[in-house]
Amino acid sequence: MQIKAEEISKIIEEQIQSYEQRVEMSETGTVLYVGDGIARVHGVQNAMAMELLEFPGGLMGMVLNLEEDNVGVALLGDDTQIKEGDPVKRTGKIFSVPVGDAVMGRVLNPLGQPIDGLGPLDAKEFRPVELKAPGIIARKSVHEPMPTGIKAIDAMTPIGRGQRELVIGDRQTGKTAVCIDAILAQKNTDIHCFYVAIGQKKATVALVADTLRKYGAMEYTTIISATASEPAPLQFISAYSGCTMAEFYRNNGKHALIIYDDLSKQAVAYRQMSLLLRRPPGREAYPGDVFYLHSRLLERAAKVNDSLGAGSLTALPIIETQAGDVSAYIPTNVISITDGQVYLEPNLFNAGIRPAINVGLSVSRVGGAAQIKAMKQVAGTMRLDLAQYRELAAFAQFGSDLDKATKAKLDRGARLVELLKQPQYEPMPTEEQVASMYAATRGLMDDVAVADIRKFETAMLDYLRSGKADILNDIKTKKALDQDIENRLKAAIAEFKKGYQA
C-alpha cells in the first residue's frame, strides 16, 4: 500500500482546521466556615442571590446573603463532608425544580428528586422556585367553588378556586385530617393536588402517602417532603418548590390545590437560617422579613383571568398555635395574608365534635361568591342558628324555665351540631350535603332523637341515592333548588321517614 504525500498533508490540514481550543471558565471560591446547614464562601465575587453553588461531592448550596467579602450560602443537603478550605464553584443557575405531569403521583424531596423508589422522573421542563406572583391585572375574583367534602366548611366557610384559606389550631386538633379530606374530595374533579410536608415526622408523611394511595387519590397528588431530620434550608425552600410545581397547572389554564403542612415549622427553619447568617432578629427572634416569607408564597395562589387561561391555584396553609393563642406573631401574620381561616379547637375535638371547627371564629372572606346557590339556600341561616344555639345553651345551663321557642332553638341547634360531625376520609358530595342540610334546616329532622341524627342522615342519603337519584342529579346539574326540586326532595324525605325505624 502506497501512501501519497499530498494525502497525508490533506489529512493534517483537515485536522488543523477542525482543531478547536476549549477553555472552561468557572469562578471558584473557598469555604471559610461551615455548620448547621450554613456555609460562608469567599471569592465568588459575581454570585447572584438564589444562585446555586457546587460544593465538593456534588452538594448544592443556595446563595442567600451577599456581603462585602463573602457570601452566606444555605446548603441543600448533608454538610458533614464539607470542611473549611474546600473549593466552591459557581453554576450560574438559579435553583429550579421539575414541573409538569411527570411529578404527578410521586413523592419528592424539595430539590425535585424522587424519594419513593419508583425510578427517576421523566421531566421535560424546569422552573425557578422563586417566581413573582401574578399582578393585579392578571387576576380575576374568586367565583368557582372548590368543595372540600366537609359539611361544616362547605356550608359556612366555603372555599373557592384561587382562594387562600388558613387552617389553624393547636396540635392534635385534626388540621392535617381536614386537608387530606379536601384532597380526597377532588377525586372526580380536574384539580391537581400538592401536599408539602414541612418538618413532619417521616412516619406521618408515610401515613399520608399510604392513605392517599388507599383511597385512589395519589394518582392526582404530589407529595413534597422535607421532614424534621432534613437541614433547615430544605425545610425553608420546600414550600416554594411545591408552589412552583403547582403553579405550572395554574399558568396552563388548569386548576391546582396546594397544602402547606405547616408554615409554623417553615418559619422556625427560616429563623434558624437567618440567625446563623447573622441577620438581625426581631419579634420572637424571627427576622424582619418573616412576613414577606409567607406573603410572597401565598400571593402566588390566585385565580387567573380568562385571557391568561383562567387557571387557578388554591392554597390551604396550616398554622399550629400554642394553647390556642391566635394573637402570636406568625398566626396573626398568616391570618392577615389569607382570605379567611378555619379554626379548630381542642375543646370541641375532645368533646367528640369532629372536625373540631369553631364556627364562630372561622370565616371565609371571598368564598361566599363561589358557593353554589343550592348551598346558600339551605345553609344561609345556619351560622346564625348555631350562634344563637351557643348563646342559649350557655343561658340554659342556669336551669331556668325555657319557653317553647327557646327550647325549639336549642333542639334545632343540637341537631345541627350533630349533623356537622363527620368521620375522617369520608368527604361528602355537595348534592348530598344540600339534601342533608335541607332536612335539618327545614325542620324535617326535628322529630329524630339527637343521638340518632347521623344514623338517620346515612339511611336517608342511601335511600335518595338508590331510589331518588334523579333529585340528587338535578341538584348537581342545576346547582340551585327550584320549587320543583324542593317539592320532590321534601316528598322523598317524608316518604323515607314513613318507612324509617330509628
Curated annotation (Swiss-Prot):
CC per GO annotation: plasma membrane; proton-transporting ATP synthase complex
The family database entries (PROSITE patterns) matched by this protein are listed as: ATPASE_ALPHA_BETA (PS00152)
Task: Provide the topology term for how it sits in the membrane.
Answer: Peripheral membrane protein
Q: What class of enzyme is it?
A: translocase
Gene3D superfamilies in alphabetical order: 2.40.30.20, ATP synthase alpha/beta chain, C-terminal domain (1.20.150.20), P-loop containing nucleotide triphosphate hydrolases (3.40.50.300)
- Which residues does the UniProt site feature Required for activity point to? 362
Q: Which residues bind ATP?
A: 169-176
Q: Enumerate the UniProt keywords alphabetically.
A: ATP synthesis, ATP-binding, Cell inner membrane, Cell membrane, CF(1), Hydrogen ion transport, Ion transport, Membrane, Nucleotide-binding, Translocase, Transport
Q: Where in the cell is it found?
A: Cell inner membrane
EC number(s) per entry:
7.1.2.2
Q: What InterPro entries is this protein classified in?
A: ATP_synth_asu-like_sf, ATP_synth_asu_C, ATP_synth_asu_C_sf, ATP_synth_F1_a_nt-bd_dom, ATP_synth_F1_asu, ATPase_a/bsu_AS, ATPase_F1/V1/A1_a/bsu_N, ATPase_F1/V1/A1_a/bsu_N_sf
Q: Would the keyword Endoplasmic reticulum turn up in this protein's UniProt record?
A: no
- Reactions accelerated catalytically: ATP + H2O + 4 H(+)(in) = ADP + phosphate + 5 H(+)(out)
Q: Looking at the keywords, is DNA damage present?
A: no
- Molecular function, one GO term: ADP binding
Q: What PANTHER family does the annotation carry?
A: ATP SYNTHASE SUBUNIT ALPHA, MITOCHONDRIAL
- Give the multimer and partner information: F-type ATPases have 2 components, CF(1) - the catalytic core - and CF(0) - the membrane proton channel. CF(1) has five subunits: alpha(3), beta(3), gamma(1), delta(1), epsilon(1). CF(0) has three main subunits: a(1), b(2) and c(9-12). The alpha and beta chains form an alternating ring which encloses part of the gamma chain. CF(1) is attached to CF(0) by a central stalk formed by the gamma and epsilon chains, while a peripheral stalk is formed by the delta and b chains.
Give the record's family classification.
Belongs to the ATPase alpha/beta chains family.
Function description? Produces ATP from ADP in the presence of a proton gradient across the membrane. The alpha chain is a regulatory subunit.
Query: What is the protein name for this chain?
Result: ATP synthase subunit alpha
Which organism does this record belong to?
Nitratidesulfovibrio vulgaris (strain ATCC 29579 / DSM 644 / CCUG 34227 / NCIMB 8303 / VKM B-1760 / Hildenborough)
